[in-house]
A protein has these predicted regions:
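Gly/Ala-rich beta-loop-alpha elbow adjacent to hydrolase catalytic centers
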Residues: 97, 101, 105
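Flexible "cap/lid" loop of the alpha/beta hydrolase fold
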Residues: 106, 110-154, 160
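Short beta-strand/loop motif that positions the catalytic acidic residue
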Residues: 208, 214-216, 220
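Active-site glycine-rich loops that stabilize anionic/oxyanionic intermediates
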Residues: 31-34, 99
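Short beta-strand element of the alpha/beta-hydrolase
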Residues: 23-31
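Conserved alpha/beta-hydrolase catalytic His-Asp/Glu region
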Residues: 129-135, 147-207
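Active-site loop/oxyanion-hole signature of alpha/beta-hydrolase fold enzymes
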Residues: 5-17, 37-96, 260-264
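Catalytic active-site module of serine/aspartate enzymes centered on a nucleophile-bearing elbow/loop
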Residues: 238-272
């Protein structure tokens, strides 16, 4: 069921599934430049894959049905997630994020650690952008400003989907294209700026004291397996899972395998 919250800057929208008084609440935060549709397979399988849990899947500000923040930033995105929890009557939750959603999860931990029961860091990395990466993001911002979001879609598809998916699943390629093309230019520019400005989360890793899943597609070239290994090594007691035949969007590319990995993690952590 879709929920909407009025905020000072506009509105925040999310899907709310499962029993309202469930013992475990899972939040799934999408990447760049997606919306909650990234998690369509997890939403569809919720009742069977994660039984008796409550699932909250937001559109980050500037994407989907959520309006942009006046000033973009990972802290602002994290605070929007906290506002969603407040509106949903949720004190603590499992916070999961993919790619940019992982950056939001790091910010949420720094700002709202008392509300985190567990973390799921998927196809993401801890370090800040290199100078080269920042320059590429500035070029993306210039392109979107000048020519619109559609001009960057083919490049994003090539970067985000693994070669196995691109070769074997044209329907999923088309699904991602639709998802990317509906991203508002203002949201894309705000999020890209936020990623340029984000801090290095490497020092954050050793402060994480809750059960943590680090998950990565074996074909991910944007945040490769080596990044996941480095994160997992720095987070005490974390669980590392590599997803075969998946690129940067493993929950979309290999949903059954990812759902099983999430369920096993939650079960071991006694959260399922």
């Amino acid at each position: 069921m879709e929920q909407t919250l009025a905020l000072p800057h506009g509105t925040l929208s999310w899907d709310d599934l499962g029993p309202r008084h469930s013992g475990t609440v899972i939040v799934l935060v999408h990447g760049f430049p997606h919306d909650r549709g990234l998690w369509s397979a997890q939403v569809a399988a919720h009742a069977s894959a994660f039984p008796a849990t409550r699932l909250l899947v937001p559109d980050l500000p500037g994407f989907g049905r959520s309006t942009p923040l006046p000033v973009a930033g990972m802290d602002g995105y994290a605070d929007a997630v906290a506002a969603m929890l407040d509106a949903a009557g949720v004190a603590t939750a499992v916070i999961g994020g993919l790619s940019m959603g992982g950056y939001v999860a790091f910010a949420f931990w720094r700002r709202h650690a008392h509300r985190v029961r567990a973390l799921m860091l998927m196809d993401t990395r801890a370090p800040a952008d290199t100078d080269g990466a920042r320059e590429k993001r500035r070029e993306l911002i210039a392109t979107v400003t000048r020519d619109g979001v559609g001009t960057i879609v083919p490049t994003l598809i090539g970067q985000q989907l693994g070669p196995t998916t691109r070769s074997n699943d044209p329907a999923l390629v088309s699904q991602l294209e639709v998802l990317l093309r509906r991203a508002p230019a203002s949201g894309v520019i705000g999020a890209a700026t936020s990623m340029i400005d984000r801090i290095d989360s490497t020092p954050t890793l050793e402060t994480i004291t809750v059960p943590t899943l680090v998950l990565v597609g074996e074909e991910d070239t944007l945040t490769p397996v080596s990044d996941a290994i480095a994160m997992s090594s720095a987070i005490r007691g974390s669980r590392l899972v590599t997803i075969p035949s998946a690129g940067h969007l493993s929950p979309l590319e290999q949903p059954d395998v990812v759902n099983a990995a999430i369920a096993e993690f939650l079960d071991v952590a006694e959260l399922l």
